[in-house]
Curated annotation (Swiss-Prot):
Catalytic reaction annotation: 2 superoxide + 2 H(+) = H2O2 + O2
Pfam families, A to Z: Sod_Fe_C, Sod_Fe_N
PROSITE patterns xref list: SOD_MN
Entry protein name: Superoxide dismutase [Mn]
Keyword terms, alphabetized: Manganese, Metal-binding, Oxidoreductase
Cofactors, names only: Mn(2+)
The EC number(s) this enzyme carries: 1.15.1.1
Cofactor: binding comment: Binds 1 Mn(2+) ion per subunit.
Enzyme type, top EC level: oxidoreductase
Name of the encoding gene: sodA
Purpose: Destroys superoxide anion radicals which are normally produced within the cells and which are toxic to biological systems.
Gene3D superfamilies: Fe,Mn superoxide dismutase (SOD) domain, Iron/manganese superoxide dismutase, C-terminal domain
Length: 207
């Protein structure tokens, strides 16, 4: 099986300034995200070894490690695509209509998503996801890298609320970081994810 790899970014580290500094993006991508990639590959190797040895305790441990590091890799891979130096503004098309229908307006959605981000205790993410069973949009808090997300949810938009994502620039004022985040949201990417989620997941879990 192929190893997990660190994805290249579609923009330079400094391209999201002044909203997210180049220093943060370089450390975030080349160190933090890279560590999750190494962690998931290490966990897979150790899991294979544990299975070969019939070591159930090691299997369970490395399955937990795999979930954490793979969660980190997936979340960050979405994160980089969710951002763009040409971002900001508001969504259009089917996604905009769904947001208006299910949240009342874009402003109400933005307020709910922002509250989820600012209110998160400890480390994690705020997420806009598509519920493939209920055919609806949801916002929720993802704890750490892998907890509190029901199966069947397709992530569309995420904001990283781990301190490594903002502390060098915004210190402990994470509300300013979340406010700045909206200026670089790549709505084209989010809309493409929504289109794929609504067209490709029907019957995926329940036939």
């Amino acid at each position: 099986m192929a190893e997990y790899t660190l994805p290249d970014l579609d923009y330079d580290y400094g391209a999201l300034e002044p909203h997210i500094s180049g220093q943060i993006n370089e450390l975030h991508h080349s160190k933090h995200h890279a560590a999750y990639v190494k962690g998931v590959n290490d966990a897979v190797a150790k899991l294979d070894e544990a299975r070969a040895n019939g070591d159930h305790a090691a299997i369970f441990l490395n399955e937990k490690n795999l979930a954490f590091h793979l969660g980190g890799h997936v979340n960050h891979s979405i994160w980089w695509k969710n951002l763009s130096p040409n971002g900001g503004d508001k969504p259009t098309g089917d996604l905009a209509a769904a947001i208006d229908d299910q949240f009342g307006s874009f402003d109400k959605f933005q307020a709910q998503f922002t509250a989820a981000a600012n209110g998160l205790q400890g480390s994690g993410w705020a997420v806009l996801g598509y519920d493939s069973l209920g055919d609806r949009l949801l916002t929720f808090q993802l704890y750490d890298q892998q907890a509190n997300v029901p199966l069947g949810i397709i992530p569309l938009l995420q904001v990283d609320m781990w301190e490594h994502a903002f502390y060098l620039q915004y210190k402990n004022v994470k509300a300013d970081y979340v406010k700045a985040f909206w200026n670089v949201v790549n709505w084209e990417d989010v809309q493409n994810r929504y289109a794929a989620a609504t067209s490709k997941t029907n019957g995926l879990i329940f036939g």
